[in-house]
Amino acid sequence: MPTESGSWAAARQTKQKRKSHSLSIKRTNSSEQDRLGLQRDMLEGQDSKLPPSVRNTLLELFGQIEREFENLYLENLELRREIDTLNDRLAVEGQAIDGAELSKGQMKTKASHSTSQLSQKLKTTYKASTSKIVSSFKTTTSRAICQLVKDYVGHRDGLWDVSVTRTQPVVLGTASADHTALLWSIETGKCLIKYVGHAGSVNSIKFHPTEQIALTASGDQTAHIWRYMVQLPTPQPMADTSQISGEEEVDFSDKDENDGDGDASSDCPTVRVPLTALKSHQGVVIAADWLVGGKQAVTASWDRTANLYDVETSELVHSLTGHDQELTHCCTHPTQRLVVTSSRDTTFRLWDFRDPSIHSVNVFQGHTDTVTSAVFTVGDNVVSGSDDRTVKVWDLKNMRSPIATIRTDSAVNRISVSVGQRIIALPHDNRQVRLFDISGVRLARLPRSNRQGHRRMVCCCAWSEDHPTCNLFSCGFDRQAIGWNINIPALLQEK
C-alpha cells in the first residue's frame, strides 16, 4: 500500500497544528496590536516556509477580515436593539388604538389567546396540507399500468419515426435510417408492406386521413406519397407479458446488437415507386404531414424552410421562411388549417392558413436549445419538446408564456399527445419513455426491466386511440418499435 511522502506528511502536520491553534483561540477585546502580536507568535511558532513579507501581508489581511466581522457583529447588535424598540413602540400604539387600559395580566392573557388562535390555525393548515399529501400517496396505489405487448423487429438501422393509420385496417408504420419504411400488423408483428422508393434515410411517416396512402420524408431531399394495400393476417395469441407498474426503474444489460439483424421484411410485398414526389427542397427533408382534409401536405427541411404542396398536382403552394436554422419537425392541427414547425434556432412557429388570401405566423420563444418537436392537442394547446430537457404546454390564445413546464433529466425527442386522455408521451435520449398529463403531472415511466424496453435512444412516440391491445408505440435507435398497452386510472388524472 503506498505511503505518504515526507512533504505531504509535513503539510498534513502543519495543517493539524493550525487547526489545533485555531480551535484554542478565544475571542477577546484586545487591541489590534495585541491580536497581530498573537497571530505573529502563532506563525513564528510553526515551521513556516513563507518569507517574512508574505507572512506580514497575511497577518494584515487576517486583521482586516476580523475587523469586518467585528463591524458586522456590532451592526447586528444595533439592528436587534432597533427591532426591540420598534416592537415596544408597536405594542404601545396598538394599546392606544384599542383604547382599553389592560393590566399586565390581561395583556398576557390576550397575547396567549391570540397565540393559541394562531397555533390552532397553523395546525389546521398543517393537517389540511398533510392530508392532501397522504391522499396523493394513497392514489399511487392505483398506479398506471404499462404493459409491453409486442416488438416490431425487421429494420437494419435505427428508427426515426413511428405512426398509426387513421383508416381501417389499423396498421403501424415505421421510418428508418436504412432507407425503408415498413408497415406492420399490430397484432402479429409481421411486416405487411416495405417501401424502398427513397435513396436516403426515411425520416418520417404519416398516413392520409381517409385513404390508404402514406407520406414519407427523406434525406434524399424529397417527400414521397405512395399507396399501399394491406390485408391483415390471422391474429395469433400475444406473448404473455407480466404487467409492470410504470414507476419501476430496474435497468438491464444491453442485449446483443445482432438481435435485430433478422430481416423480417425480406418476404413482404415491396412498393418501389411513389404516386408522386415532392422535390422543392435544397436539403434533407426531416418531416412531413397532411393538412386537414388530405388535399395538401407540408414538409420541413434542413434548408430552413417548410413547404406547402398541393397533393394532386405536386405544385408548391407556399414556401414558409423565417427560421434561422435547420427545421427539425412539422405538425398539422387535426381539425384546422394550422401548421407548427420546430427548429434548431430554439423556436417553433405557428402558421395559420385558415384564411386563403393570407397566412399569418406566430413565433414561440421559450426554449434554450433545439426544439425537437411541437404538436397540437385536441383543444387550443401546443406541446413542445426540446434538447434543453424541458417540455412546455402553450395556450394558442395566450402565447407569451407556457401554461405548464415539465423538466426532465434528458433531451426530449418527438412527443405525442393522446386525443382522449390528453396524455403526453416523452421519448428521451436516455432510453426512457415518460408519461405526463397536460398539466405537467408525471403519471408513469415505461418499464425497462426483465429485458424489456428500448436499449438505445428513443426517437418517437405515437398514440393509437382505437386499437384494443396497443394504444402507444415507441421506436428508437435499437432498430425496433414497441407496442404498449397503457392503462391510466381516472384517479391519477384528477387535478
Swiss-Prot record:
Under the heading Pfam families, the entry gives:
WD40
- For region Disordered, the annotated ranges are 1-34, 237-268
- Where does the protein principally reside? cytoplasm
Q: Which GO terms describe its cellular component?
A: cytoplasm; nucleus
Membrane-spanning residues: none
Q: Bias category Acidic residues: which stretches?
A: 246-264
Answer yes or no on keyword Repeat. Answer: yes
Keywords attached to this entry:
Cytoplasm, Nucleus, Repeat, WD repeat
Would I find Nucleus among this entry's keywords?
A: yes
Localization annotation:
Cytoplasm; Nucleus
| Ranges annotated as biased composition (Polar residues) | 22-31
Q: What is this protein called?
A: WD repeat-containing protein 37
